[in-house]
């Protein structure tokens, strides 16, 4: 009993001390100090923060959630929505106003308003920022430099950003961006830049030099990168290696002994398969060191063709060509386990599968190339006219995805059923006489659309795809297309060359078949550099269908050649 009374008296004396502390703790959790979260990273989705705005009654806390939501919306490429949220804010606390200033500067940089972004940064007291806010401050500096294509200044800003970042994933993302910047720089810039005592910059420059100097010899590249790690053991990139370079640790040079070529060589698609095979065979030439087993996918199910290739001991499959057959592999990738596969088509189901790449003459490549070309030509408000079809949907999506990456905004996409529809949609908005990317299925469509635009007085610069380019086009067509720019494979640059004449005779001058022939020729090249293509970032091959590199999911991307109609002739452009 005595012990119990003593405990009761002790608790009674302790409560006056603990109670204020408990209240103080509650204030930190529920009171005005909630806005301290602005000093930290925003790790949730914009949807999460938007829901919190609706659930919260305190105006001050609502505004904090709006700032967090706007911050994430910018990272989700939803700048307009972020600006709309910021416009709702009133009577901010000093901490909220500080966070908004950083966000306003970032939005200005995203919109390429460098002067406004720089002016806003000057109003921000850098010494008062948390580590998270400091990283965001330097991200704005980096974006301003990136807008000016000042690679080294952008890298310097991101090095400062790296020093402030604490989250591992954010550090990895930033390291990957530094690496992408340096990889985009030419060798002269990298080799002549002086680090001026900046040890981190010196490490990045040496890493880039090691990569550039050994890119043509991938077997030596892995060792060069390991030597760099030994030289810079404390460098941030030594702890978190650029994601692109991680696959090089287990790189082995491509060795091809036996190839299974899976093509439709009978039935309705035989003309496609036989043309690709001709290109493949001619590229192979007299090289008999590699055995090629040709399998007709029209004569047996593709599953049986794969089983036959395995039975033959083929280590690599080139093909299949038809999309349905590619989907068969995608639905059961274990069927090709242990084999390299260069599929000659892609489907909406395509995804990253170990030792599998996708190569074809996809219209998406042309759409992405058009976005790049128009951006480099100074176009900022493109109109994209595409047919209301699968081709139109795919090209419009590919163009817009690339345009969002370049301009942080959507392209103006307009669909048409008939050429007359396209002409009407384009002439109905004369204020947009800037530049139009027109996707057509043949030259007659382009003739109709351009004729209507000319008659209506629209003076927009016209870009288009390769399907307008046909051997059947007479000089009258080429004159009518004066000034039109289009993309196509580089093979068509030399119409007087011996190789062109040979293929022209073999295909009857049909440009569609000539493109397939070139694809077959390039598939031989790709097969012999398969590991390099998959594992060495930036590795490229100069083929008949373009400069070939591996994109996401090992989808082979083609850097196309641009041509222009000038004085009745087709002139290659730089």
Swiss-Prot record:
InterPro entries: LpoA, Peripla_BP_I, TPR-like_helical_dom_sf. Pfam families: LppC (PF04348). GO terms for cellular component: periplasmic side of cell outer membrane. GO terms for biological process: peptidoglycan biosynthetic process; regulation of cell shape. The keyword Protein biosynthesis does not apply. Residues 1-25 form the signal peptide. A lipid is attached at residue 26 (N-palmitoyl cysteine). It is a lipid-anchor. It comes from the Bacteria. A lipid is attached at residue 26 (S-diacylglycerol cysteine). Its main location: membrane. Keywords: Cell outer membrane, Cell shape, Lipoprotein, Membrane, Palmitate, Peptidoglycan synthesis, Signal. The keyword Membrane applies. GO terms for molecular function: enzyme regulator activity. It is found in: Cell outer membrane. SUPFAM superfamilies: Periplasmic binding protein-like I. Regulator of peptidoglycan synthesis that is essential for the function of penicillin-binding protein 1A (PBP1a). Belongs to the LpoA family. Interacts with PBP1a. HAMAP family: LpoA. This is Penicillin-binding protein activator LpoA. The gene is lpoA.
């Amino acid at each position: 009993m005595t012990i119990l009374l003593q405990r009761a008296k002790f608790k009674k004396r302790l409560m006056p001390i603990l109670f204020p502390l408990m209240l103080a703790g509650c204030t930190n959790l529920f009171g005005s100090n909630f806005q301290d979260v602005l000093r930290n990273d925003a790790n949730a989705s914009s949807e999460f923060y938007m829901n919190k705005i609706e659930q919260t009654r305190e105006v001050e806390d609502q505004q904090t959630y709006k700032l967090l939501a706007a911050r994430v919306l910018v990272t989700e490429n939803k700048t307009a929505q972020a600006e709309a949220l910021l416009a709702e804010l009133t009577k901010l606390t000093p901490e909220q106003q500080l966070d908004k200033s950083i966000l306003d500067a970032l939005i200005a940089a995203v919109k390429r308003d460098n002067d406004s972004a720089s002016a806003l940064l000057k109003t921000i007291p850098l010494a008062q920022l948390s580590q998270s806010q400091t990283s965001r401050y330097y991200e704005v500096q980096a974006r301003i430099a990136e807008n000016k294509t000042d690679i080294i200044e952008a890298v310097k800003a991101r090095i400062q950003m790296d020093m402030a970042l604490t989250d591992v994933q954010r550090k990895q993302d930033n390291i990957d961006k530094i690496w992408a910047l340096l990889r985009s720089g030419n060798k002269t810039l990298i080799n002549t830049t002086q680090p001026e005592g900046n040890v981190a910059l010196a490490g990045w420059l040496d890493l880039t030099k090691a990569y550039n100097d050994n890119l043509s010899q991938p077997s030596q590249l892995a060792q060069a990168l390991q030597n760099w790690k030994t030289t810079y053991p404390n460098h941030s990139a030594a702890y978190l290696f650029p994601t692109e370079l991680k696959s090089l640790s287990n790189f082995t040079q491509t060795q091809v002994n036996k190839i299974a070529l899976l093509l439709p060589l009978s039935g309705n698609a035989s003309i496609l398969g036989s043309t690709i095979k001709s290109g493949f065979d001619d590229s192979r030439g007299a090289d008999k060191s590699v055995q090629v087993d040709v399998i007709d996918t029209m004569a047996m199910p593709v599953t049986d063709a794969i089983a036959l290739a395995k039975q033959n001991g083929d280590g690599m499959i080139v093909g299949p060509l038809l999309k349905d057959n590619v989907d068969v592999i995608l639905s059961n990738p274990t069927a090709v386990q242990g084999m390299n596969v260069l599929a000659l088509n892609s489907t909406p189901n395509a995804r990253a599968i170990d030792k599998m790449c996708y190569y074809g003459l996809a219209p998406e490549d042309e759409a992405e190339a058009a976005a790049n070309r128009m951006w480099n030509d100074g176009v900022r408000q493109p109109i994209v006219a595409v047919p209301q079809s699968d081709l139109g949907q795919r090209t419009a999506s590919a163009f817009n995805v690339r345009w969002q990456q370049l301009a942080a905004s959507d392209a103006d996409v307009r669909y048409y059923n008939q050429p007359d529809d396209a002409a009407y949609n384009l002439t109905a908005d004369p204020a947009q006489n800037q530049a139009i990317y027109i996707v057509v299925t043949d030259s007659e469509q382009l003739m109709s659309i351009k004729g209507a635009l000319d008659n209506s007085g629209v003076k927009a610069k016209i870009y288009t795809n390769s399907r307008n380019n046909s051997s059947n086009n007479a000089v009258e067509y080429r004159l009518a297309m004066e000034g039109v720019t289009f993309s196509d494979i580089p093979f068509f640059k030399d119409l007087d060359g011996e190789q062109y004449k040979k293929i022209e005779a073999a295909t009857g001058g049909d440009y569609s078949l000539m493109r397939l022939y070139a694809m077959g020729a390039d598939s031989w090249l790709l097969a012999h550099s398969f590991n390099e293509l998959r594992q060495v970032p930036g590795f490229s091959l100069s083929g008949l269908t373009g400069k070939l590199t591996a994109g996401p999911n090992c989808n082979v991307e083609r850097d196309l050649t641009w041509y222009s109609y000038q004085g009745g002739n087709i002139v290659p452009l730089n």
